[in-house]
Regions:
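ABC transporter nucleotide-binding domain
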Residues: 151-178
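Non-catalytic connector elements of ABC transporters
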Residues: 171-286
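Short clusters of hydrophobic/aromatic residues that line enzyme substrate/ligand-binding pockets
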Residues: 1
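ABC ATPase nucleotide-binding domains
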Residues: 10, 16, 20-160
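Phosphate/pyrophosphate-binding loop motifs in nucleotide- or prenyl diphosphate-using proteins
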Residues: 7
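Tryptophan-centered motif/residue detector
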Residues: 13, 51, 163, 226, ...
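Residues that scaffold the ATP/ADP-binding catalytic core of kinase and kinase-like folds
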Residues: 4, 98, 155-158, 167, ...
Length: 286
């Protein structure tokens, strides 16, 4: 590959800043790769316009990069890369500059294209949603070390470190397996449905939506119940995430609806009880 001139390598790259040619319009930028491959001008412009339309910036075809917002420029850069028909597609944080709504639309378009893409695509991202929704395989790196290299579904179900689990928005508690669960490194005991061999170093993973929140101590089915205090409330789309601290368990993140929060009169500093069913805990050996 290194012996070939760049335009013959079949590689397209989208850097974080887009790197559009400032003297060319969005349309000419997008058609550039096709023209270097010898595609006639009219055909290249038609295909370029089609890609701009798919990514929601077709109406900006005749604008120069200096006339585009950061999110618009990023979509044009993505259109330019996809239009070039590469064998290797390199995407560096391709959706980072987009707002939430646009990101979902572009992610859908990109996923549809990658499903039909015959080449190799390498995506670098800090967004776990982006990684698991676009990739066939996820390689998780931390400080240069490979923490996990598996299909997205396996990474989501069985994260191999607290860092990976928390990156995916899960509660992650390391500990040592006992006959009925896990003795937590941060203090406390967790009952699980499928315990490992006693003495095994393991990681308990709990989804925030699996944590029930009550104002009174629950008397129902949860095997794991702790008192705690709400320390932080953040909005995550249509749900609220609560950071709950306790002297009987490590910090816990719960996810509830705004309606449930209103009914429970949840606020910063509210005293609550949390519950986790044993069947909702995934235990991964370390």
């Amino acid at each position: 590959v290194t012996a070939l001139p760049p335009h013959r390598r079949g590689v397209a790259w989208v850097p974080q800043d887009g790197a559009l040619f400032p003297h060319l319009s969005a349309l000419s930028n997008t058609a550039y790769g096709l023209r270097t491959h010898g595609v006639p001008r009219a055909e290249a412009r038609r295909e370029a316009q089609s890609w701009l339309d798919r990514l929601g910036v077709g109406h900006l075809a005749h604008r120069k990069p200096g006339q585009l917002s950061g999110g618009q420029a990023q979509r044009v850069a993505l259109a330019r890369a996809l239009a070039a028909r590469p064998r290797l597609l390199l995407l560096d944080e391709p959706l980072a500059a987009l707002d939430q709504t646009t990101r979902a639309h572009v992610r859908h378009t990109l996923r549809r294209h990658l499903a039909e893409f015959g080449g190799v695509c390498l995506i670098v991202t800090h967004d776990p949603v982006e990684a698991v929704s676009l990739a066939d395989r996820v390689l998780v790196l931390d400080d240069g070390r490979v923490l996990q290299d598996e299909p997205p579904s396996e990474v989501t179900r069985h994260p191999r470190s607290p860092w990976v689990a928390r990156m995916l928005g899960r509660n992650a508690w390391p500990g040592t397996a006992t006959a009925d669960g896990l003795e937590l490194a941060g203090g406390g005991h967790l009952v699980v449905a499928e315990p490992l061999a006693p003495g095994t170093e393991a990681l308990a993973v709990i989804a925030p939506e699996a944590v029930s929140v009550h104002r009174e101590k629950p008397t129902g089915s949860p095997r794991n119940v702790w008192p705690g205090t709400v320390r932080e409330i953040t909005s995550g789309g249509s749900r609220l995430r609560l950071l709950i601290t306790s002297d009987r368990a490590p910090d816990l993140v719960a996810e509830i609806t705004p309606q449930a929060a209103a009914e429970l009169r949840i606020a910063d500093g509210t005293q609550v009880w949390t519950g986790v069913k044993a069947t909702e805990v995934t235990v991964v050996p370390l």
